[in-house]
Each structure stands twice: as structure tokens, then as C-alpha cells.
Amino acid sequence: MTALRKLLIVEDDEGLQRQLRWAYDDYEVIVAGDRASAIDALRLHEPDVVTLDLGLPPDPDGVEEGFRALGDILRLKPDTKIIVASGHGARSS
């Protein structure tokens, strides 16, 4: 049996964490809710792919912390594939 590829989901919204975990059930999913946890998980698990929400605590309405996380990930593991996502600018109905 082959090992599942590892996916690190960096998302502070618990509902979205659950949805993404469900959507990627063919991956070994690791979840982090903030930049520090994401960097710890990156070092520990060495994921193949990272999905990164730009709106992370302490300012989930901004993008600065997400860009800091992106920079940290690229500096530590430059070959990691990263999918950047953000709800900023999304329309509410």
C-alpha cells in the first residue's frame, strides 16, 4: 500500500477546516490555525502541498500574517507547492 500524500491546511476557520479535510480525504491532512502552528507542522510533517489562507490571526481581516506565513514556508521548504486562498473581496449575500 502506498503512503498518502501530505497536505497542510492553514486556515483559522474551523468550519472551513472540516470542509477541506473532507474534500481532501485522499490525502493525509494536517491542519494549522495560525502561522506558528503552520511552521511547526511544516517542519514536523514536511507536506507535499500547503493550502494557505491569507487572513490569519491575529488579524484575520488582513493579509499581513498570511504573507508572513508564505514567506516562512518558502524560506524553510522552497520546493513546497502552495495554494493561496482568501475570502477577501468575497461578496456576501
Where do the model's predicted regions map?
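Short, flexible coil/linker segments at domain boundaries that flank nucleotide/cofactor-interacting
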Residues: 1-3, 77
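Short amphipathic alpha-helix used as the core "switch/output" element in two-component signaling
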Residues: 40, 55, 60-79
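Negatively charged, flexible loop motifs adjacent to catalytic sites
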Residues: 88-93
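Two-component/phosphorelay signaling modules centered on CheY-like receiver
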Residues: 2, 13-36, 44, 49
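Redox-cofactor binding/interface segments in oxidoreductases and associated redox assembly factors
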Residues: 52
